From Swiss-Prot:
Pfam families: TMP-TENI. PANTHER family: THIAMINE-PHOSPHATE PYROPHOSPHORYLASE, THIAMINE-PHOSPHATE SYNTHASE. 4-amino-2-methyl-5-(diphosphooxymethyl)pyrimidine binds at Q35, Y36, R37, D38, K39, N67, T105, K135. Its cofactor is Mg(2+). Mg(2+) binds at D68, D86. Condenses 4-methyl-5-(beta-hydroxyethyl)thiazole monophosphate (THZ-P) and 2-methyl-4-amino-5-hydroxymethyl pyrimidine pyrophosphate (HMP-PP) to form thiamine monophosphate (TMP). Belongs to the thiamine-phosphate synthase family. One of its GO terms (biological process) is thiamine biosynthetic process. This is Thiamine-phosphate synthase. Binds 1 Mg(2+) ion per subunit. SUPFAM superfamilies: Thiamin phosphate synthase.
Length: 207
């Protein structure tokens, strides 16, 4: 499949009490990839929530990825996103198979992106591009990096970090394939607004 469009990432605290309803609202608006991101140690809840997301993704034809847990991804038969502290990519590829989508966090480093590509990544993720609630201390990236990555890395490029409808367009214009969004999507007050935002993010790729 072509990896291009909105990359929605969940936040269990942000979505407390409205987890599946707001995720489904996003899927209604159109989501290319959905990442389940939960940093707690509650394995039973994480499995339950991931299974719920998998059912929704199957209904809407969206690819599900698990953040930082290749074993859970393998159990569900879905993809995984790995950060630089989550272990090497090669064992995850061996575990999940050739067809699985595996993403790699590359911060603001072309060297990390090249390494990820050589290890079998499906896409590389750069960021943060703007002030981020989720990762305030992450190294900053800029659109110049995107242009260099587009020329050097032959993989889809995801961008993350404080992305909203007000600042996303230049990232797409400079080569981003995937807009990875958490608060800019799920911070909406209503499910209807989540759907509207999802559609608006996707519209940036249509021009």
């Amino acid at each position: 499949m072509k990896l291009r469009g909105l990359y929605a990432i969940t936040d269990s605290q942000l979505l407390a009490g409205r987890f599946l309803s707001h995720v489904e609202a996003a899927l209604e608006g159109g989501v290319c990839l959905l990442q389940y991101r939960d940093k707690t140690d509650d394995a039973a809840r994480r499995l339950r929530e991931a299974e719920g997301l998998m059912k929704l993704c199957e209904r809407y034809g969206t690819q599900l990825l698990i953040n930082d847990d290749a074993e859970l991804a393998a159990r569900l038969g879905v993809g995984v996103h790995l950060g630089q502290t989550d272990g090497p990519l090669t064992p995850a590829r061996a575990l999940l198979g050739r067809q699985a989508i595996i993403g790699s966090t590359c911060h603001a480093s072309l060297e990390l992106a090249a390494q990820a590509a050589s290890e079998g990544a499906s896409y590389v993720a750069f960021g943060r591009f703007f002030n981020s609630v989720t990762k305030p201390g992450a190294p900053a990236a800029n659109v110049g990096l995107l242009e260099q990555a587009r020329a050097q890395v032959k993989l889809p490029i995801a961008v993350i970090g404080g992305i909203t409808l007000d600042n996303a367009a230049p990232l797409v214009a400079h080569g981003a394939d995937l807009l990875a969004v958490i608060h800019g999507l799920f911070g909406a007050d209503s499910a209807q607004e989540v759907t509207r935002r999802a559609r608006a993010f996707n519209a940036l790729f249509a021009s």
